[in-house]
């Protein structure tokens, strides 16, 4: 019987890391993502932080920098040009979404129980990321808080719905959290944690300082796998007791 308890102890030790590993260093199953992350030494400007290990290609990184990114067939100039600083935040957010291999814990199927296409859900952006994005965009204009749904499409281009006036971002997004969480329909979540806390993700970082999101993904991958593993190993433990 002692040998079974040794095996059980080993399971408690090893399985969490194995299960969490499935959520690490992965790419989404999505239109523009590579199947596996890897080096891409010719990524454009704001996508460069991921050049050593990226889920995006050079072409994807180039398209992310356009005023009307071909990636989503979506015009960010529906209420006129964004300010340069505001536009830069959106480029960084698109690069983060397309290039990061550290988003595994937040990947969800678009259709429940099917993995043909995936999306991100509640990615915890650091407090400073949301605050700076909101501050630099509050004087730019938009006509909607949800940029994923409810547009009027004409000749393949998105336009504002009737009775949806172009107003400063701050009218549609009164707080930094509103901007982070509403604009792409809960793709991001405004975290109360700060950068370098190990508990939130940065949508951009200095490449020379290393990727801080690796540690964060590791933490959340372990947290995500813990409940299911605990249930499975507890059930196995009860079986051992019943047959002792």
From Swiss-Prot:
Question: Where found?
Answer: Cell membrane; Cell projection, Microvillus membrane
**Where is the segment annotated Important for interaction with IZUMO1?**
62-81
Q: Which residues are glycosylated?
A: 73
Matches recorded under InterPro entries: Folate_rcpt, Folate_rcpt-like
The residue ranges crossing the membrane are none
Recorded topology in the membrane: Lipid-anchor; GPI-anchor
Instruction: Establish whether keyword Membrane is in the entry.
Output: yes
Q: What does this protein do?
A: Receptor for IZUMO1 present at the cell surface of oocytes (oolemma), which is essential for species-specific gamete recognition and fertilization. The IZUMO1:IZUMO1R/JUNO interaction is a necessary adhesion event between sperm and egg that is required for fertilization but is not sufficient for cell fusion. The ligand-receptor interaction probably does not act as a membrane 'fusogen'. Does not bind folate.
Q: What does the subunit comment say? A: Monomer. Interacts with IZUMO1; the interaction is direct. IZUMO1 and IZUMO1R/JUNO form a complex with 1:1 stoichiometry. Interacts with FCRL3/MAIA; FCRL3/MAIA replaces IZUMO1R/JUNO as IZUMO1 receptor after sperm-egg adhesion, thereby permitting species-specific gamete fusion. Interacts with WDR54.
The family classification in the record reads: Belongs to the folate receptor family.
- UniProt protein name: Sperm-egg fusion protein Juno
Annotated organism of origin: Rattus norvegicus
């Amino acid at each position: 019987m002692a040998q079974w308890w040794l095996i059980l102890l080993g399971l408690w030790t090893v399985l969490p890391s194995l299960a969490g590993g499935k959520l690490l260093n992965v790419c989404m199953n999505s239109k523009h993502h590579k199947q596996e992350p890897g080096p891409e030494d010719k990524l454009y400007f704001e996508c460069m932080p991921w050049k050593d290990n990226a889920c995006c290609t050079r072409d994807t990184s180039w398209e992310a920098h356009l005023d009307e990114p071909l990636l989503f067939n979506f015009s960010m100039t529906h209420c006129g040009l964004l300010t340069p600083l505001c536009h830069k935040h959106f480029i960084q957010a698109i690069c983060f979404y397309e290039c990061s291999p550290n988003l595994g814990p937040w990947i969800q199927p678009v259709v429940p129980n099917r993995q043909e296409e995936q999306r991100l859900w509640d990615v915890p952006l650091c407090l400073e990321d949301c605050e700076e994005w909101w501050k630099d965009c509050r004087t730019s204009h938009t006509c909607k808080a949800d940029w994923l749904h409810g547009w009027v499409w004409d000749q393949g281009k998105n336009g504002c719905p009737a009775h949806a006036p172009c107003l400063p971002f701050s009218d549609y997004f009164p707080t930094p959290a509103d901007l982070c969480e509403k604009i792409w329909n809960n793709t991001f979540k405004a975290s109360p944690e700060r950068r370098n806390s190990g508990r939130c993700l940065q949508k951009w970082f200095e490449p020379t300082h290393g990727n801080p999101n690796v540690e964060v993904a590791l933490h959340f991958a372990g947290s995500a796998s813990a409940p299911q593993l605990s249930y499975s190993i507890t059930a196995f433990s009860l079986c051992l007791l019943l047959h002792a």
